[in-house]
Amino acid sequence: SFKVDTALIVAEERLQLADRLGEEYVNQGLMNLADALNKIGKHENALNVLDRVKRTGAVRKDTYFYYLYHTTYLSCYNDETEASRKRLFMRQIKAYKDTLIAISDPNTASYVTNQCGRLGLQGKWDEAIRILTGYYEHCTDTNPDKARVEYLLAELYLGKRDIQQAKHFLIRASITDIANAKKVYMSLQQLAILLFQEGDIARAYNYISCSLEDVSFGKARYRIIDIAEYLPIIKAANDSRIKADR
């Protein structure tokens, strides 16, 4: 199980120890701290911490460093409502996606997922799906990136309005998460929304409730905003369904 608040405490303690061990340990500690801050919803704080990382040769080649900038700006984009700031954040997302593609080995999940993500942003759904499917066919059950690849395939199919294929890969990603004992359930949450839109209220409510329990357990406040929009609507629909069945 994973608790974000615990991760923040550990990151802060590791950073204190890193001061005695040298620059690269400090840089790694700052990255861990930024990751934890982003996950508790303190995105601007996370960016400030990342800006403190010294751009050593090792850091400039570290995909984790650029991944953190990418995901933090993505969090900023998702939380923002003002159009001009959303455009600013999207420019940063695209820039860091390009950087990740440039420094990643072409045979890695980092390269392939960011390449396909960029194609998706350009509306090139079929090309992105073709490339990612090719990579996915070689993913074993022990591949730690398997669920992430399945989730991205679902997003790409959603982009081209193929709801059935999107549901297929969301189900697969959910199963992979459960098999790997990962209390993430982002795929389950998205699946709940699709099922609700199709009128399958009971399953939608069960799945989004499971996602909410995960967020509450892990104290992952960065994900509450993802659930908050649909949870009241799905709950109200489920309450109406139960009353109608009585």
Task: List the model feature ranges, each with a label.
Residues S1-K243:
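A "functional boundary" signal
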